[in-house]
């Protein structure tokens, strides 16, 4: 049983490594920007043909075809990546980078801060967080969530009590009708407890 588990673990590990290698493959971002591939319609690995490669290069029929390719290669080929591997993002002068110069647009763009009361001006406002559990000087019943919870809890409790009373009344009524015959003999008999001395 142990070799089967080891083999299954090995297959799982190889599948995970293959998937992580596949995730690191590079897709040309220019193709995505030009709109060749839409959402989910990325090219398949077999369909991608690099420059200088033709589809005939990959169609080898079997033994003997590989020898012809080795003879035509003179030296080691240096593979240059098609996409530069830097992370530089070019600055574009688009509509998002325009700074408004007209006074009317500047006024519309302003963010007006909230007014701070004179008592709170001395405190550090950036770290002040209003939490419902830290509110001081307020009654617990003034908060709406507490009132809602109390009302819902009361309604559920009253319904539970009503159903319990109805169940008890139903059982008492059934008992009065005689459906429970207490004078009935039991199905089993108790074994005699006589002791015999030998």
Curated annotation (Swiss-Prot):
PANTHER family documented for this protein: SYNDECAN, SYNDECAN-4
Keyword Iron: no
Residues in the Extracellular compartment per record: 19-145
Topological domain spans for side Cytoplasmic: 171-198
One Pfam family named in its UniProt record: Syndecan
Positions annotated as glycosylated: 39, 61, 63, 95
Stated family: Belongs to the syndecan proteoglycan family.
Tissue occurrence: Detected in fibroblasts (at protein level). Also expressed in epithelial cells.
GO cellular component terms, A-Z: cell surface; costamere; extracellular exosome; focal adhesion; Golgi lumen; lysosomal lumen; plasma membrane
InterPro entries assigned to the protein according to its UniProt record, in alphabetical order: Neurexin-like, Syndecan, Syndecan/Neurexin_dom, Syndecan_CS
MF-aspect GO terms: fibronectin binding; identical protein binding; protein kinase C binding; thrombospondin receptor activity
Protein's UniProt name: Syndecan-4
Oligomer status and interactors: Homodimer. Interacts (via its cytoplasmic domain) with GIPC (via its PDZ domain). Interacts (via its cytoplasmic domain) with NUDT16L1. Interacts with CDCP1 and SDCBP. Interacts with DNM2; this interaction is markedly enhanced at focal ahesion site upon induction of focal adhesions and stress-fiber formation.
PTM comment: Shedding is enhanced by a number of factors such as heparanase, thrombin or EGF. Also by stress and wound healing. PMA-mediated shedding is inhibited by TIMP3. O-glycosylated; contains both chondroitin sulfate and heparan sulfate. Ser-39, Ser-61 and Ser-63 can all be modified by either chondroitin sulfate or heparan sulfate, and the protein exists in forms that contain only chondroitin sulfate, only heparan sulfate and both chondroitin sulfate and heparan sulfate.
Bilayer-crossing regions: 146-170
Annotated source species: Homo sapiens
Record key words, sorted: Glycoprotein, Heparan sulfate, Membrane, Proteoglycan, Secreted, Signal, Transmembrane, Transmembrane helix
Signal peptide interval: 1-18
Function: Cell surface proteoglycan which regulates exosome biogenesis in concert with SDCBP and PDCD6IP.
SMART domains (UniProt xref): 4.1m
GO biological process terms, semicolon-separated: cell migration; inner ear receptor cell stereocilium organization; negative regulation of T cell proliferation; neural tube closure; positive regulation of exosomal secretion; positive regulation of extracellular exosome assembly; positive regulation of focal adhesion assembly; positive regulation of stress fiber assembly
